[in-house]
Protein backbone atom coordinates (compact mmCIF):
# COMPACT_ATOMS: atom_id res chain seq x y z
CA UNK A 1 0.00 0.00 0.00
CA UNK A 2 1.49 3.34 -1.08
CA UNK A 3 1.87 6.37 1.08
CA UNK A 4 -0.58 9.25 0.67
CA UNK A 5 0.77 12.57 -0.53
CA UNK A 6 -0.77 15.99 -0.05
CA UNK A 7 -0.45 19.13 -2.14
CA UNK A 8 0.42 22.30 -0.24
CA UNK A 9 -3.23 23.35 -0.37
CA UNK A 10 -4.42 19.98 0.98
CA UNK A 11 -1.75 19.97 3.70
CA UNK A 12 -2.66 23.51 4.80
CA UNK A 13 -6.39 22.64 4.94
CA UNK A 14 -5.73 19.40 6.80
CA UNK A 15 -3.53 21.02 9.43
CA UNK A 16 -5.39 24.31 9.71
CA UNK A 17 -2.61 26.67 8.71
CA UNK A 18 -2.13 29.05 5.81
CA UNK A 19 -0.22 28.41 2.60
CA UNK A 20 2.08 31.26 3.63
CA UNK A 21 2.88 29.45 6.89
CA UNK A 22 3.78 26.30 4.93
CA UNK A 23 6.00 28.34 2.65
CA UNK A 24 7.72 30.01 5.62
CA UNK A 25 8.25 26.69 7.41
CA UNK A 26 9.63 25.26 4.17
CA UNK A 27 12.01 28.23 3.73
CA UNK A 28 13.20 27.88 7.34
CA UNK A 29 13.56 24.11 6.81
CA UNK A 30 11.29 23.30 9.75
CA UNK A 31 9.15 20.91 7.70
CA UNK A 32 10.56 20.17 4.27
CA UNK A 33 8.16 18.52 1.81
CA UNK A 34 9.07 15.06 0.61
CA UNK A 35 8.68 15.91 -3.08
CA UNK A 36 9.77 19.30 -4.32
CA UNK A 37 9.71 20.12 -7.99
CA UNK A 38 11.93 22.74 -9.53
CA UNK A 39 11.38 25.43 -12.10
CA UNK A 40 8.18 27.09 -13.19
CA UNK A 41 4.98 25.40 -12.12
CA UNK A 42 6.79 23.19 -9.65
CA UNK A 43 4.75 20.80 -7.58
CA UNK A 44 5.27 20.36 -3.87
CA UNK A 45 3.93 17.30 -2.08
CA UNK A 46 3.90 16.48 1.61
CA UNK A 47 3.98 12.89 2.83
CA UNK A 48 1.79 11.63 5.67
CA UNK A 49 4.73 12.02 8.09
CA UNK A 50 5.33 15.57 6.82
CA UNK A 51 1.68 16.41 7.51
CA UNK A 52 1.96 14.98 11.03
CA UNK A 53 4.98 17.25 11.59
CA UNK A 54 2.99 20.20 10.24
CA UNK A 55 0.14 19.39 12.65
CA UNK A 56 2.55 19.19 15.59
CA UNK A 57 4.15 22.51 14.60
CA UNK A 58 0.72 24.16 14.28
CA UNK A 59 -0.28 22.80 17.70
CA UNK A 60 2.91 24.02 19.39
CA UNK A 61 2.41 27.49 17.95
CA UNK A 62 -1.27 27.47 18.95
CA UNK A 63 -0.41 26.92 22.62
CA UNK A 64 1.78 30.01 22.62
CA UNK A 65 5.29 28.81 21.88
CA UNK A 66 7.48 31.12 19.82
CA UNK A 67 8.46 30.00 16.34
CA UNK A 68 11.98 29.13 17.54
CA UNK A 69 10.67 27.14 20.54
CA UNK A 70 8.10 25.29 18.41
CA UNK A 71 10.74 24.46 15.78
CA UNK A 72 13.13 23.11 18.41
CA UNK A 73 10.31 21.22 20.09
CA UNK A 74 9.23 19.60 16.84
CA UNK A 75 12.80 18.59 16.01
CA UNK A 76 13.29 17.14 19.48
CA UNK A 77 10.04 15.15 19.31
CA UNK A 78 10.82 13.73 15.85
CA UNK A 79 14.29 12.69 17.05
CA UNK A 80 12.94 11.17 20.28
CA UNK A 81 10.10 9.18 18.70
CA UNK A 82 10.85 7.45 15.41
CA UNK A 83 7.21 6.29 15.27
CA UNK A 84 5.62 9.73 15.67
CA UNK A 85 3.93 9.44 12.25
CA UNK A 86 2.58 5.93 12.86
CA UNK A 87 -1.20 6.26 12.82
CA UNK A 88 -1.44 3.61 15.53
CA UNK A 89 0.94 5.45 17.87
CA UNK A 90 -0.61 6.10 21.25
CA UNK A 91 2.50 7.71 22.70
CA UNK A 92 2.10 10.72 24.94
CA UNK A 93 4.70 13.37 25.61
CA UNK A 94 4.95 16.58 27.60
CA UNK A 95 7.03 19.69 27.22
CA UNK A 96 7.84 21.75 30.27
CA UNK A 97 10.19 24.61 30.97
CA UNK A 98 13.56 24.08 32.59
CA UNK A 99 14.27 27.33 34.44
CA UNK A 100 17.98 26.60 34.86
CA UNK A 101 18.55 25.86 31.17
CA UNK A 102 15.91 28.38 30.10
CA UNK A 103 14.57 25.91 27.56
CA UNK A 104 11.83 23.38 26.99
CA UNK A 105 12.32 19.79 28.05
CA UNK A 106 10.58 16.89 26.31
CA UNK A 107 9.68 13.81 28.33
CA UNK A 108 7.46 10.84 27.82
CA UNK A 109 4.21 11.52 29.67
CA UNK A 110 4.02 10.31 33.24
CA UNK A 111 0.84 11.29 35.06
CA UNK A 112 2.46 11.58 38.50
CA UNK A 113 5.31 13.69 37.16
CA UNK A 114 2.91 15.93 35.22
CA UNK A 115 0.80 16.50 38.34
CA UNK A 116 3.93 17.21 40.40
CA UNK A 117 5.01 19.82 37.84
CA UNK A 118 1.57 21.42 37.91
CA UNK A 119 1.58 21.41 41.72
CA UNK A 120 4.83 23.40 41.57
CA UNK A 121 3.17 25.96 39.30
CA UNK A 122 5.05 24.68 36.27
CA UNK A 123 3.28 24.91 32.92
CA UNK A 124 3.21 21.76 30.83
CA UNK A 125 2.33 21.22 27.19
CA UNK A 126 0.86 17.80 26.46
CA UNK A 127 1.49 16.13 23.11
CA UNK A 128 -0.92 13.27 22.50
CA UNK A 129 0.11 11.81 19.15
CA UNK A 130 -3.10 9.78 19.06
CA UNK A 131 -5.15 13.01 19.17
CA UNK A 132 -3.11 14.56 16.37
CA UNK A 133 -3.61 11.45 14.23
CA UNK A 134 -7.35 11.48 14.99
CA UNK A 135 -7.62 15.11 13.90
CA UNK A 136 -5.85 14.33 10.63
CA UNK A 137 -7.97 11.19 10.06
CA UNK A 138 -11.23 13.10 10.62
CA UNK A 139 -10.24 15.68 8.03
CA UNK A 140 -9.09 12.98 5.61
CA UNK A 141 -12.38 11.07 6.04
CA UNK A 142 -14.40 14.25 5.36
CA UNK A 143 -12.39 14.92 2.21
CA UNK A 144 -12.80 11.33 0.99
CA UNK A 145 -16.56 11.40 1.61
CA UNK A 146 -16.93 14.69 -0.23
CA UNK A 147 -14.88 13.43 -3.18
CA UNK A 148 -16.94 10.22 -3.30
CA UNK A 149 -20.10 12.34 -3.33
CA UNK A 150 -18.78 14.22 -6.36
CA UNK A 151 -18.08 17.49 -4.57
CA UNK A 152 -15.24 19.45 -6.17
CA UNK A 153 -12.83 20.46 -3.41
CA UNK A 154 -10.57 22.75 -5.38
Regions found by a protein language model. Give the residues of each.
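Basic Lys/Arg-rich amphipathic helical interaction modules
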Residues: 1-2, 58-154
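Basic helix-turn-helix/winged-helix DNA-binding cores
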Residues: 1-53, 59-65
Amino acid sequence: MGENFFTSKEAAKTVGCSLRQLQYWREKEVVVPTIRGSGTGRSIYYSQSDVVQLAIMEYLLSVGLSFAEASRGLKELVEADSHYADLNSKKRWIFFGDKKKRSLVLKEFDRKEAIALLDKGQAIIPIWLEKIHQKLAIYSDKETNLKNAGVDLV
